[in-house]
Regions:
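Structural alpha/beta surface segment adjacent to cysteine/selenocysteine redox centers
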Residues: 4-107
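C-terminal cap of thioredoxin/glutaredoxin-like
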Residues: 1-24, 89, 98, 102-186
């Protein structure tokens, strides 16, 4: 939810700063066990409850529609991550950021199942991208990048999403975007 809540603001901050963005989806299922993170269902009940409070606060504060308990969450995000990588490779970072936003919105605002390749194809078309990216997302080079991005995340000590890294300085969470903006203004 936090990546969804921060995505548009991050794009605006990066654009205003003229920053170069590298989109690097990672497999949180592999990152969490190494970094001590727990999947949502394994967290203590009070943490799960407070997460919903914070989501509602940020959704209202940012005026972003959001289902606190979307129909398709948790959801397997590997195919969606590979689609983002395929779009980045074949259409560039701006297109990858656009499809990322569409995928996040699909889960958190529209209750669409991003584990369904038909839904991913629809999202590509809605972003004026060729649905051929679905086939490209299954190619070995895309999977290799996904694996590399996940390993890189582990190697640099990332432990959650969203994480923004600027000049080797890490900012975790959409609530750190003010710090991201300040760093980019240096």
């Amino acid at each position: 939810p936090w990546t969804y809540l921060g995505h548009q603001r991050f794009m605006q901050i990066a654009k205003a700063a003229g920053a170069t963005v590298r989109v690097m989806p990672m497999d949180l299922g592999k990152v969490f066990p190494i970094s001590g993170g727990l999947p949502l269902g394994k967290r203590a009940p009070q943490r799960q409850a407070y997460r919903l409070v914070e989501m509602a606060r940020f959704s209202k504060h940012l005026n972003m529609p959001m289902h606190l308990k979307p129909k398709f969450f948790p959801v397997a995000g590997d195919d969606a991550a590979r689609v983002i990588i395929a779009v980045d490779l074949h259409h560039g970072t701006q297109a990858a950021m656009a499809i990322t936003g569409a995928i996040l919105k699909a889960v958190w605002a529209q209750e669409r199942d991003i584990a369904d390749t038909q839904v991913l194809g629809e999202l590509l078309v809605e972003q004026n991208l060729d649905a051929a990216c679905l086939a490209q997302a299954t190619q070995a080079d895309v999977q290799e990048r996904y694996t590399q991005y996940t390993q890189r995340a582990i190697d640099v000590g990332l432990f959650g999403a969203p994480t923004y890294v600027i000049e080797d300085e890490m900012y975790w969470g959409q609530d750190r975007l003010d710090f991201v903006a300040r760093h980019l203004q240096r």
